[in-house]
């Protein structure tokens, strides 16, 4: 009793094998083998056009097996396809022969011996037939003379790249099929009802295949009209990578460059370091992106963004230079005011006396001056007659003054003397006073002295973010709207 399950299983297997043999088609007696049929066909076959009166109708379809990445530098992409051709050749019909099957799988060595439309991809850069391990070609001959050929191909085909919208761009790549040897009077090419099929979802590192389409055209060559079949693949770039690797770092770099507005105007080394570091960082990021793109003469969306960001960082450097300039201008104004105050404290007053407007000098607000010059025996002034201004704003001559030739005078007159009104005894003081006035430059001309560095920084810390926000609104609205329009089309 313990062997009942094993016996039941054996009986079921026997019944199933018997039913399978009953369903198997039996060849009639006297049926020819495939080799004998092919030898008979090829013995009388001539490799000429199948139909001399009309053009041969060739139907084509492709099955997309896989795709490689789209290369922007070389402007091409790689694709693996199963390329199928179907046509009718009455000379290969074996319906009149006693065949066991209605179709025969031919050896690939017989393919060069039969007529073919010689269809090729005229725009491919490279096309190879897979060999793993043998050549991946299948030829099936039907009893009515229909020939079905399938090649497993690896194709490298060009793409029409337009990078104006990069990295929000949409690219198209085209495969073009033609008969290399026969024009449309001999061979007509047609797409099958389901011309292109995807064997699996296509996922590329940088792109999504969003659409594909087929069409047929007729082109005029010097030797006639030729049928041309085209399949167009549309790819949309995944820009998430560039958002993370390009846009976010530039945002951070721009914000870092604005930190200099919060520093003191006197912190020139720190502000310069921040600005130059931000500028170098943006330049490095821009170059890192451009090295993976072809050299095109038009402006890309990424170019607009990077150049705009570089302009904003450069603007912070210009603002720094402006702040430094007006800071120096303010210092010059303050220094000029101090020097003018010292000049007012050392003016020459009427009647040969000098009165200071400050209250810190000795001698009751008077200075000592040589009122009557003395001369030596040669009639020349003594070397002690050279006037000098003391550190307290007093004017005296070199050398120890003599009581005989000194006179102290004080007046209440506030009318200053001009050089023409100076007494003869003070004519020798004219160069000294002129030198004093020439060493005190006038304040800077123009209205830059009215600005204050702190006010410029406060204005910049508001104006730069507002301008950058406006730039962002215009930039993203322009390019994203064009991207949506392309998707809609």
From Swiss-Prot:
Annotated spans, Disordered: 365-398
Annotated TM spans: 241-261, 274-294, 304-324, 459-479
Major subcellular site: membrane
GO biological process, one term: chloride transport
Cytoplasmic topological segments: 325-458
GO MF annotations, alphabetized: ligand-gated monoatomic anion channel activity; serotonin binding; serotonin receptor activity; serotonin-gated chloride channel activity
Gene3D superfamilies: Neurotransmitter-gated ion-channel ligand-binding domain, Neurotransmitter-gated ion-channel transmembrane domain
Extracellular side stretches: 21-240
Cell compartments where the protein resides: Membrane; Cell membrane
GO cellular component terms, A-Z: neuronal cell body; plasma membrane
Keywords for this protein: Cell membrane, Coiled coil, Glycoprotein, Ion channel, Ion transport, Membrane, Plasmid, Signal, Transmembrane, Transmembrane helix, Transport
Membrane topology (UniProt): Multi-pass membrane protein
Stretches with biased composition (Polar residues): 372-391
InterPro entries xrefs: GABAA/Glycine_rcpt, Neur_chan_lig-bd, Neur_chan_lig-bd_sf, Neur_channel, Neuro-gated_channel_TM_sf, Neuro_actylchol_rec, Neurotrans-gated_channel_TM, Neurotransmitter_ion_chnl_CS
Binding site for serotonin: 180, 226
Expression (tissue specificity): Expressed in a subset of muscles, and head and tail neurons, including RME and GABAergic ventral nerve cord neurons. Expressed in AIY, RME, RID, RIF, ASI, DD1-6, and PVN neurons.
Function: Functions as a 5-hydroxytryptamine (serotonin) receptor. This receptor is a ligand-gated anion-specific ion channel, selective for chloride ions. Relays a long-range endocrine signal from the body cavity neurons to modulate distal adipose triglyceride lipase atgl-1 function, via the nuclear receptor nhr-76. Together with the G-protein coupled serotonin receptor ser-1 involved in male mating behavior. May mediate an inhibitory effect of serotonin on egg laying.
Family per record: Belongs to the ligand-gated ion channel (TC 1.A.9) family.
NCBIfam families in the record: LIC
Record protein name field: Serotonin-gated chloride channel mod-1
Gene that this polypeptide is encoded by: mod-1
């Amino acid at each position: 009793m313990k062997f009942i399950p094993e016996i039941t299983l054996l009986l079921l297997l026997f019944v199933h094998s018997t039913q399978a043999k009953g369903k198997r088609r039996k060849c009639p007696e006297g049926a020819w083998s495939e080799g004998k049929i092919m030898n008979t066909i090829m013995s009388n076959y001539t490799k000429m056009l199948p139909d001399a009166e009309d053009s041969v109708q060739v139907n084509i379809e492709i099955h997309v097996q896989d795709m490689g990445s789209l290369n922007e530098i070389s402007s091409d992409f790689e694709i693996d396809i199963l390329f199928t051709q179907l046509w009718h050749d009455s000379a290969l019909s074996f319906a009149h022969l006693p065949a066991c099957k209605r179709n025969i799988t031919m050896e690939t060595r017989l393919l060069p011996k039969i007529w073919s439309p010689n269809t090729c991809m005229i725009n491919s850069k490279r096309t190879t037939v897979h060999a793993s391990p043998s050549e991946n070609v299948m030829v099936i001959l039907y009893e009515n003379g229909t020939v079905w050929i399938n090649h497993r191909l690896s194709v490298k085909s060009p793409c029409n790249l337009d990078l104006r919208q990069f990295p929000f761009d949409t690219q198209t790549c085209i495969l073009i099929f033609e008969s290399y040897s026969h024009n449309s009077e001999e061979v007509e090419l047609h797409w099958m009802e389901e011309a292109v099929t995807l064997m699996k979802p296509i996922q590329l590192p940088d792109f999504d295949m969003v659409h594909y389409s087929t069409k047929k055209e007729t082109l005029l060559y010097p030797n006639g009209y030729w049928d041309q079949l085209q399949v167009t693949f549309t790819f949309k770039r995944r820009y998430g990578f560039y958002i993370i690797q390009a846009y976010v770092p530039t945002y951070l770099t721009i914000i870092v460059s604005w930190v200099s507005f919060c520093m003191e105007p006197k912190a020139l080394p720190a502000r310069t370091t921040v600005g130059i570091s931000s500028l170098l960082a943006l330049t490095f990021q821009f170059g890192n992106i451009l090295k993976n793109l072809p050299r095109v003469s038009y402006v890309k969306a990424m170019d607009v963004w990077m150049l705009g960001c570089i302009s904003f960082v450069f603007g912070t450097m210009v603002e720094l230079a402006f702040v430094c300039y007006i800071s120096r201008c303010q210092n010059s104004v303050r220094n000029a005011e101090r020097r003018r105050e010292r000049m007012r404290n050392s003016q020459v007053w009427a009647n040969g006396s000098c009165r200071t407007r400050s209250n810190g000098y000795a001698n009751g607000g008077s200075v000592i001056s040589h009122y009557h010059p003395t001369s030596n025996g040669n009639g020349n002034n003594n070397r002690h007659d050279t006037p000098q201004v003391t550190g307290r704003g007093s004017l005296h001559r070199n050398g120890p003054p003599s009581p005989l030739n000194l006179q102290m005078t004080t007046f209440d007159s506030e009318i200053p003397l001009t050089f023409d009104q100076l007494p003869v005894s003070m004519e020798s003081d004219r160069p000294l006073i002129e030198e004093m006035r020439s060493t005190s430059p006038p304040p800077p001309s123009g209205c830059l002295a009215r600005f204050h560095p702190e006010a410029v920084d406060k204005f910049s810390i508001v104006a730069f973010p507002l301008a950058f926000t406006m730039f962002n609104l215009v930039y993203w609205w322009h390019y994203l709207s064009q991207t949506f329009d392309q998707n809609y089309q």
